[in-house]
Amino acid sequence: MILKSFILGNLVSLCMKIINSVVVVGLYYGFLTTFSMGPSYLFLLRARVIEEGEEGTEKKVSATTGFITGQLMMFISIYYAPLHLALGRPHTITVLALPYLLFHFFWNNHKHFFDYGSTTRNSMRNLSIQCVFLNNLIFQLFNHFILPSSMLVRLVNIYMFRCNNKMLFVTSSFVGWLIGHILFMKWVGLILVWIQQNNSLRSNKYIRSNKYLVSELRNSMARIFSILLFITCVYSLGRIPSPIFTKKLKETSETEEREEETDVEIETTPETKGTKQEQEGSTEEDPSSSLFSEEKENPDKIDETEEIRVNGKEKTKDEFHFHFKETCYKNRPVYETFYLDGNQENSKLEIFLDKKDKDLVWFEKPRVTILFDYKRWNRPFRYIKNDQFKNAVRKEMSQYFFSTCRSDGKERISFTYPPSLSTFLEMIQRKMSLFTTEKLSSDELYNHWNYNNEQKKKNLSNEFINRVEVLDKGFRVLNILEKKTRLCNDETKKEYLPKIYDPFLSGLYRGKVNFFFSPSIINEISIKNYIEMLWINKIYLILLISNYQEFEPKMEDRIRILKFLFDAIIVDSKNKKIVKKSTEIKKEISKQIPRWSYKLIDDLEQQEGENEENAAEDHEIRSRKAKRVVIFTDNQENPDSNTYNNSKTKDTTNFDQTGEVALIRYSQQSDFRRDIIKGSMRTQRRKIAILKLFQANLHSPLFLDRIDKFLFFAFDTSELMKIMFINWMCKNAEFTISDSTSTYTEEKTKESDKKEKEEIKNRREEDKREEKVRIEIAETWDSIIFAQAIRGCVLVIQSILRKYILLPSLIIAKNIIRMLLFQIPEWSEDLKDWNREMHVKCTYNGVQLSETEFPKNWLTDGIQIKILFPFRLQPWHRSKFKFLSKDPIKKKRQKNDFCFLTVWGMEAELPFGSPRKELSLFEPIFKKLKKKIRKLKKNGFLTLTILKEKRKLFLHLPKETKNWFIKGILFLKEIINKFSKSKRNPILLFGFREVYELNETKNEKNSPINNRTIHKFSTSIRSMDWINYSLTEKKMKDLNARTKTIRNQIEKITKEKKKRFLISERNISPNKLSYNAKRLKLKSSKNILQILKRNNAQLVRKSYFFIKILIEKIYIDILLAIINIPRINVQFFLESPRKMINKYIYMYNKKENHKRIEKTNQNTLIHFISIIKKALNYSNFNKNSKIFYNITSLSQAYVFYKLSQVQVINLYKLRSVFQYHGASLFLKNEIKDYFGVQGRFQFKLKDTNFRNSVMNEWKNWVRSTYQYKYDLSQIRWSSLISQKWRNRMNQQHMIQNKDLNKWNLYDKDQLIHYEKQNNFEVDSLSNQKDNFKKYYRYNILLYKSINYEDKKDSSIYELPFQLNNKQELFYNYKIDKRKLFDMSGGIPVNKHLTEDDIIDTEKSSHRKYLDWRILHFGLRKKVDIESWIDTGTKQKKNLFDWMGMNEEILDRPTSNLEFWFFPKFVILCNAYKIKSWVIPIKLLFLNFNGTKNVSENKKINKKKNNDPFISISSNETKSIQLKNQNHEEKESEDQVDLESVLVNQEKDVEEDYVRSDRKERRKKKQYKSNTEAELDFLLKRYLCFQLRWDDSLNQKIINNIKIYCLLLRLTNPREIIISSIQRGELSLDILMIQKDLTLTELMKKGILIIESTRLSVKNDGKFIMYQTINILLVHKRKQQINQRYRKKNYIDKKNFNESIVINQSLTRNKDKNNYDLPVPENLLSSKHRRELRILISFNSKNGNDINTEIINNNNIKNHAHIIDKRKHFDRDKNKLIKLKLFLWPNYRLEDLACINRYWFDTNNASRFSMIRIHICPRLKSR
């Protein structure tokens, strides 16, 4: 067996080696290369298909030889560099390709261009074989690949980087390609043979009969192949942008001249006393107006032209002035323009610059770059705009670029090498003659690198050890800390250069400033040298001048330059203004450097800024095609401007300064641009597929499965399945008579509701289909060239024809016909209707303008013509007094009293809709005729039937009866005549009775015997004279049969009624006496009915006339009563208990809510026990109902609830369970801990010394409170924290910790914790939340390296306090793995108190929390906190209590908004409290309700307010603090009132956030109203919510706008207003909106709604890295601000307090544990700290060693003897603290980001784990 396995293992390893060998991989890749087809295959196939005979064989051989030779050259070029350069450069391949393609095209078509003959046989026959060889060779070198792509060819190039034996790999890959090529050609040959031998093809009649066509095809085959070749070449060229016509970078110089100067501020020390000098010619400018205007090398100024002002007097085209680059320094402009004085050496300068400009011309525009730009300026094709971090467009290119660089002292290939640096290096190598071409060996480089690193490490280590030794001697820390070096003018005066100009400072203080020195301080000899070195780009200097050393400044000149730094800037101590000197130079010295703009704009932004000053010339981003349609032009001044948005129709309105109101109309076509940048390659975008004629959104074929209806299956399978299932259920369902009339009626109502819903659904689907067709028609018109102009002209012609020709002619014809028919003509009525018809010109989307005014650019953009009150030609006019139609369909038809004109002159409901059916002139005539004919037919039928019956009667009656009957009739006639003589109305004893059906009664739906019993009652005819007896006999028989069925039905109903009342007696409470009374009443009515029905037959037989009618009436009335009474009673019976139950539940809930409100602040509440009480109380509500408990979650809780009711129990049997301090497998930790704290069992507390027993009373109190599951909100928890109280507890804890038993439940291993979690035994929050949070944020490896021994007691990452998390019994438990900065969704508002969610308000008083008094909401009543905390369930919570609103509620009117808004806003506010550094504090001082009245005692210290995202990493306090919180600080000169902040709100918004990029074009925008300012403030700030209005309101407003645009143009709009209000188009409630409403009032009225935005956060590597670093940077900021609030430590004050470092980070536990020690490395500056750690990690000899001198020195002596004082301190913890203090100082994560790119050539944070190899070596314990 061993032998077999050994042999098998060897075979497997052998096979693996063979598969992974270079030869096999090369063969495989070469074989794959075969599948990439190109145009060269066309020549090869043509030689095989066309050529025949001896010459054809030669051509086949030559074609194959050329093809293989070309491919071999391509493979060799991979390895051989010169050949690769020749074939790989675009210049050479284009020089080869273009002439050869032209030659080849004319070679095949030069002679017989219009003939059908073979051209290759007759001309230059001797060269034909050579030409075939060249064709195949050269086209193989062109490297054009069509199918499937060129990726397969490049696989060989890619694998070359991994392969060691490159030549063998190239050879094997070529052999593999050759094998694939041979197989392919064999396959082609087989196909050709099969085609020749196939009889079906040869026997085709069409082919045989057209032999001439076949021969013609063979002769023209050469031309066909040339056409195919041309198409493939065009296809290949189409995939790359044209090098000449692509959009290049702007190179035009736009000079910007300013008349103003800004005073430059300078920072001085308190001892500084500057000299006073006059300032000449400077005017003060508002500081806020230039904020962020030219940040970061003036990013949006594409040119960097510098200007010089001449004499300070006049400005001409040739006179310019210089200005510094402006940077953000504490929210103030640091510079503005800066003039030079002097009048010397201007002529020399002019001569020198003229000479230099001539030399620069040829280099600036080389000939090659005209065709090819290998720097790829047009490379990026996507622009991601980020308001917080605006990067260059160039940033979006790929980060992978291969080049060699030195890393760790060795030459290595870097795949993230900057391409610009590589290009620059190549330029230097070509141009510089002194460039060293000698290369050192790798060993020499490595040794030199190691030596330098060792020297640096020794120097830094010695400096660090010296500082620690001095500190150990007892010196002050401030004297030992390493200071930053600053540039100083004089030691005595201590006048420093401002930080923005100081070259020795780093970070945000550094600004990029271009200094230009005055010729007055430089002698005449060196003037040219300085101009060369400082004004001309140094890159060009290096490239042009080889002897560059002669231009280096000498030492004396350097001294003069430094002297100039202080002479040029002179300080006035009072005004803090910089006085500037100026010189004059008459010539422009500028260099236009092509650079990418930092902000690109699209069409819409360009149109918005057209009327602003300094607007952008052209847009850079190609966005969706849009047309701007002006709908209204206001000639008057517009005091206030509003903005309307229509999301459905994609219309946005735009207000210009001219008063134009415009709609932006977007087409429904696919957006092929997709925000592409001009000049970029579209082919590099993701491929898209077009599936429909008009597809609004393009998408990749990858997402075909996510489309609603798949491409090949047009029907919806889910709908078909539903229909089939319903039909199947209906077939199998048995028809049963329902036991209850109410259930029957409910089913009927459900069915009717279902039918109505289906009808509504079908109607909506039909509307959607019609809308889709309409949009397609509109887009078709819009897409065809000149279609809009043709359509517009046709519409105008149709409008004129209709109004002035067609309708008047119809009116004339109608009235002439009326006169011919002797009717009164209706000229006035028709003319009135004709005058009422209005033809309103509309925009393409249907916005009404006026009758006379045409839309702007209507011939190109389109036009619609809307007909208001369309004329209807009527044969006659009705009287005005008529009833309104109650039919909703007719009402709807009346409402839509307008239409749109179509091209064919017809009417449509909507633009491009289907034409509606027009009412004909003869339709009412035909209707009237039909009615009359129907009436005549009815009357005639009745008379005929009566006559027939009379005739039958007289035939069958005997003579005596006839005589008696005739006498009676004569007698009646006499009586009638008497009555008629007396001129009275005749008494109609009998008359016609109308036919009716029972189904037409009102109770049709409620009748249980509907469609099953009586369908029709017979027709009874009441005659005026006599009735036929035979007819009555027939009716009698029918009536008898019907009587029997009625009797049976009544009996059946009574039985059902009895049965139903028997059931109801059991359920109805006995005090409901009305039911018994009704039942007796029903019984009595039933008996009467039965008596009547028994005698019914006899009564009918005796009296055939009156009693028959009477019985029918009685029968109908009683039957309907019997049917209705049970229905009403049963319905009442069913509804009353339901109401009673609902009322009971409501009262119960109200009572419970009241209890909950009273118990809000009782911290001793046990949550799960209270829930059990509620469940038990609820179970008593109905004894018959059964309650099923979840045994896994409720069994222990219920048992221990019963146990808790006993005062003291001697739980002897459970003693071992309670005394066991490990992880219990069957007893929940929280229950055990609860019983231990409450003392429910009697046994002695054992004083055990556990490893984690060091715990203060604060944490025990929180644990004991929180484990009772009283779930407060995070905000309420933060209010409970008191730092002083906790410190006092700490102080007491040092004495009391001996006898404290903490119930060691909190130090659990993660794996056990995971098993316990699955068994519903959840461990503490301090472990669980810690683990998930840190695993997600810092990466698993980083977390383990920090806290790999003890996850609980980390001295660095312990946060303010830790709490115990328990598994809830009734709520869903969620582990919060949230994203870091996803503010709207990622921050949890749940029932868990996480560590990082707590903010210590006393410690962090610099933060201004979002006060609820700022945002005014109408709250209806107080509600418990628990009603709005998210418990994980999907309960709708309408009200909430937030930050003490129960105690103080604003007296404001209630808002009519829905309360769905509030929970979302709660998330936002909690997010603000948790991460308040994201939102600028200035934001909170804007008064939202429009008033600016603020109490005077509140003033703001406007101190260095910076952009919040920049200020994260700042080293100084940048916040605004209230005056009453800053009593210990002096009042500075910068203090301003809050009113001034609000007055300057517009400028702050625009300059502080928007950072006007395009030459300050947005800077001068002025707001016209408070509303506009507030809207801008809200929408452009960092708050994560947006304003919107309701959808229904949205459509209403758009409709109103359309009506307003029409009304404003009409002279007498009264009639249109009234009709619009009647039709519902004009809403009066929207008209009541005032234009001066503030944002708060708009929200109160429900017009505007605030809702949180749905942010889509892409957590890529850079984002995670930034967030990881950001955590420590925030703590660093907190540490600097909270220095004055720092409390004293309570340990060894003599030795330890002296060594507390000021810059100590606050990331450690704020409880001041005894192991919370300072980091000794903080003695060094951050730069040297980083350098020391990196150099220690670069220990080349032993990678796992670290410098033991630093560890074993005396720098840890102070910490060691403090720790030894503790009695029960763990020994291992001492070593662990030393290790952590040494390995992980506070700046460690900052180092990770800095080192990451340079060590591992990556900026992707997913590779963080690799860094631990160097940074975190494991220490062996000694």
Curated annotation (Swiss-Prot):
- Membrane spanning segments where? 18-38, 67-87, 90-110, 127-147, 175-195, 224-244
Any coiled-coil regions, as ranges: 1031-1102
Topology relative to the lipid bilayer, per the entry, is: Multi-pass membrane protein
Q: Which UniProt keywords apply?
A: Chloroplast, Coiled coil, Membrane, Plastid, Plastid inner membrane, Protein transport, Transmembrane, Transmembrane helix, Transport
Under the heading InterPro entries, the entry gives: TIC214
Q: Where in the cell is it found?
A: Plastid, Chloroplast inner membrane
Assembly and interaction partners: Part of the Tic complex.
Known role: Involved in protein precursor import into chloroplasts. May be part of an intermediate translocation complex acting as a protein-conducting channel at the inner envelope.
Anything else of interest in the record? There is a partial copy of the N-terminus (positions 1-601) of ycf1 in the inverted repeat (ABO36758).
Recorded family membership: Belongs to the TIC214 family.
- Please identify the protein, giving its name as recorded: Protein TIC 214
